[in-house]
Amino acid sequence: MELYTYYRSTASYRVRIALALKGLDFTAVPVNLLVPAGGANRQPEYLAINPQGRVPALRTDEGELLIQSPAIIEYLEERYPQVPLLPEDLVARAQVRGVAAVIGCDV
């Protein structure tokens, strides 16, 4: 797997945490978001990966490209269930997703 990431991106950090908790190997592909030093996320090469020009983006082992940290983490949870990130209880799962939504949308 390849994770297109920026070290100061909280969205990328969430995915890196999920990958680490699951013990999954990945290659970090740094995307410099700063202009004028970087702005790599606005270059045609990266826009072909994520047309929104945002990080993170994940290229799976099968070659599929995924964007948006909640979707990537959900994919990891379903694709690699051996080390679950979510509790088994339905209500507890919903509560965890609620907290994740607050963090992702409101923080």
Model-predicted segments: where are they?
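GST-like domain detector, emphasizing the conserved glutathione-binding G-site
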Residues: M1-V107
